[in-house]
UniProtKB/Swiss-Prot annotation:
Record-linked Gene3D superfamilies: Vaccinia Virus protein VP39
KW Signal (keyword) present: no
Record localization: Cytoplasm
InterPro entries: Ribosomal_L11_MeTrfase_PrmA (IPR050078), Ribosomal_PrmA_MeTrfase (IPR004498), SAM-dependent_MTases_sf (IPR029063)
Protein's name according to its UniProt entry: Ribosomal protein L11 methyltransferase
E.C. number: 2.1.1.-
GO biological process entries: methylation
PANTHER family the record matches: ELECTRON TRANSFER FLAVOPROTEIN BETA SUBUNIT LYSINE METHYLTRANSFERASE
Top-level division of the source organism's lineage: Bacteria
Class of the enzyme per the UniProt entry, highest EC level: transferase
Organism: Acinetobacter baumannii (strain ATCC 17978 / DSM 105126 / CIP 53.77 / LMG 1025 / NCDC KC755 / 5377)
Alphabetical keyword list: Cytoplasm, Methyltransferase, S-adenosyl-L-methionine, Transferase
GO-annotated cellular components: cytosol
Length: 301
């Protein structure tokens, strides 16, 4: 069986209508992609952020016995969505849901880590190899903020320590800490898909027995009144600033922390909020202005 893809570039406010339209016309899947290489810096908790211009792609089964008339389909779509760019392509029979696997390769991060897609062999068997299913949730090592956090973990003593991974995404940071010898990782995310992905990636790496992961309200019940030795949070500046008092309660005196998901222009504001509770020891910058802020919890009496 072949597949037909229809790509439509629309403004943000047209996305929901376009998705619904494609599904009503029999699309088996609809995906959203950035049309202008625009960074998404500050979504609110629980929101799915969108770019200003979005490529909405509908995928249709193209039955050889009763094929879709592409000209008729496009004419109808153009009548509903006039003056928007639109194109189509046909795909040969394949497992298109996982076709993206061909584009992933192992990534080396610092001196300790390799991020290895689960279907590939590690380039260095003796390295700390993190097996990952990149299709499950955000956090593959490709993004600068994830890279910065992994780099920091590789230099931080986590052996036999309690670690919090706040905003865990794919679970890559928590898994990395466990592979480095952490006693226990407590991970949390507002996205149920991220909770599932973290469990699955921990299982891939044989560390599920030392991991707890849940939504924030579940995490609060499970973790408190403990305190962690290490806390890493790869989210965004707004949520990070709001969570500073909470992180101060979660981390032991003199405990290590790292924050990422912050761009250079936001470093001063985030550091200013955290300086009440934490000593800022280092700010590391990577390409595209993404930064990591790290330091220690101030000693409390």
């Amino acid at each position: 069986m072949k597949w037909l893809q229809i790509h439509i570039t629309v403004d943000q406010e047209q996305v929901e209508f376009t998705e619904t339209l494609l599904m009503s016309l029999g699309a088996v899947s609809v995906t959203l992609d950035d049309a202008e290489d625009q960074a998404l810096l500050e979504p609110l908790p629980g929101e799915t952020p969108l770019w200003n211009k979005v490529i909405v792609t509908g995928i249709y089964q193209q039955d050889e016995q009763d094929p879709i008339d592409v000209d008729t389909l496009e004419a109808f779509l153009k009548a509903q969505l006039p003056d928007v760019p639109m194109r189509h392509e046909e795909l040969e029979d394949q497992v298109w849901e996982r076709a993206w696997m061909d584009y992933y390769e192992p990534i080396q991060i610092g001196e300790k880590f390799w991020i290895v897609p689960e279907w590939l062999e590690p380039p260095e068997a003796d390295a700390t190899n993190i097996k990952l299913d990149p299709g499950l949730a955000f956090g593959t090592g490709n993004h600068a903020s994830t890279f910065l956090c992994l780099q920091w973990l590789g230099k931080t003593d986590v052996k036999d320590k309690i670690v919090i991974d706040y905003g865990c995404g794919s679970g890559i940071l928590g898994v990395a800490a466990l592979l480095l010898g952490a006693k226990k990782v407590y991970a949390t995310d507002i996205d149920p898909q991220a909770v599932l992905a973290t469990k699955q990636n921990a299982e891939l790496n044989g560390v599920l027995d030392r991991l707890y992961v849940g939504l924030p309200e579940e995490f609060d019940q499970e973790f408190k009144p403990q305190q962690a030795d290490v806390l890493v949070a790869n989210i965004l500046a707004g949520p990070l600033m709001a969570l500073a008092p909470e992180f101060a309660k979660l981390l032991k005196s003199d405990g290590d922390f790292a924050l990422a998901g912050v761009i250079e222009e936001q470093v001063a504001d985030v550091s200013g909020v955290y300086s009440e509770f934490f000593d800022i020891l280092d700010v590391e910058k990577r390409e595209e202005n993404w930064c990591r802020i790290s330091g220690k919890r101030k000693t409390t009496n």
